[in-house]
Amino acid sequence: SSLLSKLKIKDNGQIVISLLPGSRKKEVQYILPILISVSKLLSKKIRKPILFLCQVAPNQEKLVDQILKKMPNEIKIVHKHLLGNELTSSSDYAIITSGTATLEYALNGIPSIALYKTNFLSAFVGRRLIDMDKIILPNWILGKKYMDFIFQEKCNPEYISEKMIKLIKDKNKPNELLVYAKKLRDLLTANDKTFKENIKNIIEAKLNF
């Protein structure tokens, strides 16, 4: 792909897995070490070569660099402000810290897993104030489970790796997700309105249901 050539990485037909540790400091601190461990487990358990590309938000470059240096890994960095969109289209799979990126990857039909981990108190309060089914935008908009969401206690390298291996082995999943991606695009481009307007209308309609 053009992204690999820009990153000066040889395309050997490897599986490309995007890692998105989030854009907030606490997210990166909690989640990036987990993603590094996941990358090591997947490299051991999957025979085909894997290329892990980590998307880094502009405000977290220093922190990401510090964490990556502390934990030996084979992860390559992709700067969001330079190549973020190309990373999405070049990915075979993704592991995403929940947020708007879940919608971006869903619209591209990329098989993905969403996850989130925070401190105990924030998780405790969050579970009581937020409907967990509504955290992942594509799931909520489509009204069905498009993307697995792994939260808090289950957000550990072993469990995430198991889920990713299952996703990679499911040969029907990419075609299935492309169908859902079209449904999402149709919903979000309806009535000649912008994505933003349609997302706002869909969310308001669901909240008022």
Which residues fall in each region the model found?
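Nucleotide-activated sugar donor-binding and catalytic core shared by glycosyltransferases
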Residues: 1-209
